[in-house]
């Protein structure tokens, strides 16, 4: 309905002298079904050329003032700093087997943890192996983190095959 109102407003402003055209267009819009309107919109968007799009983008970027840019960048960095990836659908998290570090920008997705191989570089894994650097017991496969290392769990018995 909002789209219809916008179309009517634009059409009215362009053809303010021709009342008969306005009435005809208004009647057509009122009688048009939603599918007809969506088809018309799709046809219009398909007819837009690349040059028209690039011109529109250039005009939009020219309208951004220099004072707006630092504010936008500052707000974006604050949002990204709060974005600690725990959900696999999030933008900047790493999946299993990918490079990771224990920084904000290279976290593992979901329940994956970063198994460090060096000073800050590692690989995302399901759980940390024995003697790997840990902070929480839940990160270790053994579920036992002592003195920042994953330790053997004496309560878990390994059954030989």
From Swiss-Prot:
One Pfam family per UniProt: UPF0506
Keyword Ribosomal protein carried by entry: no
Keywords carried by this UniProt record: Disulfide bond, Glycoprotein, Knottin, Secreted, Signal
Subcellular location field: Secreted
Database matches in InterPro entries: UPF0506
Cysteines paired by S-S bonds: 127-141, 134-145, 140-150
Chief site of localization: secreted
Glycosylated position list: 15, 19, 31, 43, 47, 59, 63, 75, 121
Signal sequence residues: 1-13
One GO cellular component term noted in the UniProt record for this chain: extracellular region
Keyword Signal attached: yes
Domain writeup: The presence of a 'disulfide through disulfide knot' structurally defines this protein as a knottin.
Family (UniProt): Belongs to the UPF0506 family.
Protein name: UPF0506 protein SJCHGC02965
Organism expressing this protein natively: Schistosoma japonicum
């Amino acid at each position: 309905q909002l789209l219809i109102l916008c179309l009517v407003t634009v059409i009215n402003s362009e053809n303010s002298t021709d009342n008969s055209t306005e009435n005809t267009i208004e009647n057509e819009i009122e009688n048009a079904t939603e599918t007809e309107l969506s088809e018309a919109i799709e046809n219009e968007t398909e007819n837009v050329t690349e040059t028209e799009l690039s011109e529109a983008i250039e005009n939009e970027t020219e309208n951004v003032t220099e004072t707006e840019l630092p504010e936008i960048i500052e707000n974006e960095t604050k949002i990204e700093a709060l974005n600690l990836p725990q959900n696999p659908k999030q933008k900047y998290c790493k999946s299993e087997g990918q490079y990771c570090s224990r920084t904000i920008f290279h976290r593992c997705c979901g329940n994956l943890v970063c198994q460090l191989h060096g000073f800050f570089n590692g690989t995302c894994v399901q759980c940390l192996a024995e003697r790997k650097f840990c902070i929480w017991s839940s990160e270790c496969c053994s579920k036992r983190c002592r003195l920042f290392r994953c330790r053997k769990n004496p309560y878990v018995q390994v059954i030989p095959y």
